[in-house]
A protein has these predicted regions:
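Bacterial Sec-dependent N-terminal signal peptides
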Residues: 1-21
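Thioredoxin-like thiol-disulfide oxidoreductase module
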Residues: 61-64, 68-133, 138-145
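Soluble non-cytosolic domains of exported or imported proteins
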Residues: 37, 41, 57, 130-134
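Structural motif corresponding to alpha-helix initiation and N-cap regions
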Residues: 22-26, 60, 98
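Short active-site neighborhood of thiol/selenol oxidoreductases, capturing the structured segment around
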Residues: 34-48, 73
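Thiol-/selenol-based redox modules, centered on thioredoxin-like
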Residues: 130-174
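A short beta-strand-turn-helix
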Residues: 21-37, 67
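Detector for the c-type heme attachment site
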Residues: 51-55
Length: 174
């Protein structure tokens, strides 16, 4: 009976949509990564577009595959009440005022905002706001492929469907 349940579970697993394997900021601060960037999703519990990103964009199989393979994906509640350590620095929750944005989210102007960090923890790029999966794939691949060092983003967007997407799809299907 256990064998049959295992076989059924294995078969159903292939039918389930891809999911991003999110990590906590605590896990990320202790992770030893060399060949990936950190992708930090700064969100709040009240943010409607944050929930829409989770529901629509991050559930997209291509988005999930890129994030899981090329980045170290982290979710961080920008209103967290925990003190955290990140790359040798300590960040504390804010206790002043109505907008209690965590010290680690300082500089984030709105939610959702996604920040890419190099492996050493230095910020590379902030990406503010909601984006549908079709647009987010372009943004993620721009950084995952290293094309961010070769082309300005506006040119890259124009090239993507004809010149870059076929290469990306081959790479993702390896």
């Amino acid at each position: 009976m256990k064998k049959i349940l295992f076989i059924i579970a294995t078969m159903l697993g292939g039918l389930l949509p891809a999911q991003v394997q999110w990590h906590t900021i605590e896990e990320a601060s202790q992770a030893k990564i060399d060949n990936k960037m950190y992708f930090v999703d700064f969100y709040t519990d009240w943010c409607g577009y944050c929930k829409k990103m989770d529901r629509e964009t991050f559930s997209d199989p291509t988005v999930a595959k890129i994030l899981n393979r090329y980045f170290y994906p982290v979710k961080f509640n920008a209103e967290s009440s925990k003190t955290i350590a990140w790359k040798g620095q300590t960040y504390r929750p804010s206790t002043a005022g109505r907008n209690k944005t965590h010290e680690f989210a300082r500089g984030v102007q709105g939610f959702p905002t996604f920040v890419l960090y190099r492996a050493d923890g230095t910020p590379l790029q902030a990406i503010p706001g909601y984006a549908p999966a079709s647009e987010f794939v372009v943004i993620l691949w721009y950084f995952a492929s290293g094309d961010c060092d070769k082309y300005p983003f506006d040119r890259y967007q124009k090239m993507f469907d004809k010149e870059i997407r076929p290469t990306m799809e081959k790479e993702l299907n390896k």
